Regions:
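Short alpha-helical patches at coil-to-helix transitions and adjacent helical residues
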Residues: 18-23, 144, 237, 241
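Ordered, soluble secondary-structure elements with a strong preference for glycine-centered loop motifs
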Residues: 11-12, 137, 198-203
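Short glycine-rich or small-residue beta-strand-to-loop segments that form or flank ligand, phosphate
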Residues: 9-12, 192-194
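Flexible, small-residue-rich helix->loop connector segments that border functional cores
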Residues: 24-41
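Histidine/acidic-residue-rich, glycine-tolerant segments that coordinate divalent metal ions
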Residues: 2-10, 16-17, 36-169, 177-181
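Active-site alpha-helical elements of protease catalytic centers
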Residues: 12-29
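Metal-dependent amide/peptide-bond hydrolase catalytic core
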Residues: 148-248
């Protein structure tokens, strides 16, 4: 519902702040003697479609060959826009009070809340059988119920997620295309499985897929799981992070 969204899509993590920061960097580099002692060239770039949202739409673009990757950063590199770059620095908004801890790693809450986790992007499709909800519900298989059961099973897994892995599973239901008096025969879900390491992401994603599949079996429904690589976990260089904090 953002007033400047295009086709219902807009960035969600303060990209206006990132753009302002880039303009500030450009202005600083134009100051007298700012580039003294430096060689080479400096390129200021922004990454469009950086957030991995609208997964079904992006997967459609990928299937058509319009894009190769669902994430803007990965697509950016694939198209060669960082070719010839020897060193890159990223500017992004942060939670107030976040910092590098004594072990040289980012604080745990910062790692989780700032989205620095890696992720697997998931498209989930439950397939049931439509029937008249009032007259013959026994002839249908409710895809919505199967999806709800699958999400409940995933919620019951949360106590098995270890805090050190900062696992996050946050699905959204994409809705059913049917009337109120019809047993829904399809329900789509989009989600991520996020984590602090690739090992943790893969391990917990297996659990999630098992829960989603088990729910379909218990209801006599079908389920299609499509997992696509998202972003790898991000780790900050502690020395450079400290330098950036001191400069601020």
């Amino acid at each position: 519902n953002h007033p400047e969204s295009v086709n219902g899509m807009t960035h969600c993590c303060g990209h206006n702040a990132q753009s302002a920061a880039l303009l500030g960097i450009a202005a600083a580099l134009k100051q007298p003697h700012a580039l003294d002692g430096l060689c080479g060239s400096i390129r200021l770039v922004v990454v469009p479609a950086e957030e991995m949202i609208q997964l079904a739409f992006r997967e459609e673009l990928r299937q058509k060959g319009i894009i190769k990757y669902n994430g803007g950063k990965t697509e950016f590199m694939y198209r060669g826009l960082l070719d010839g770059v020897d060193m890159a620095m990223m500017v992004h908004g942060m939670t107030k009070g976040s910092s590098v801890n004594e072990d040289g790693d980012t604080d745990l809450d910062f790692q989780a809340l700032l989205g620095m986790n890696g992720c697997i992007a998931k498209n989930i499709r439950y397939k049931g059988k439509s029937a008249h909800a009032g007259g013959a519900p026994h002839m249908g298989v409710n895809a919505e119920y199967a999806a709800m059961l699958g999400l409940q099973a995933c919620n019951d897994l949360r106590e098995t997620f270890q805090e050190k892995d900062t696992i996050r599973f946050h699905p959204i239901l994409m809705g059913a295309n049917c009337a109120v008096n019809i047993i829904p025969d399809e329900m789509k879900i989009e989600s991520y499985v996020r984590g602090k390491s690739l090992e943790a992401i893969k391990r917990e994603n297996i659990k999630v897929n098992r829960a989603l599949t088990g729910a379909a079996l218990s209801m006599g429904a079908g389920v299609e799981l499509s997992d696509r690589p998202g972003y790898a976990p991000e780790y900050h260089d502690p020395t450079f992070m400290k330098l950036a904090e001191d400069c601020c």
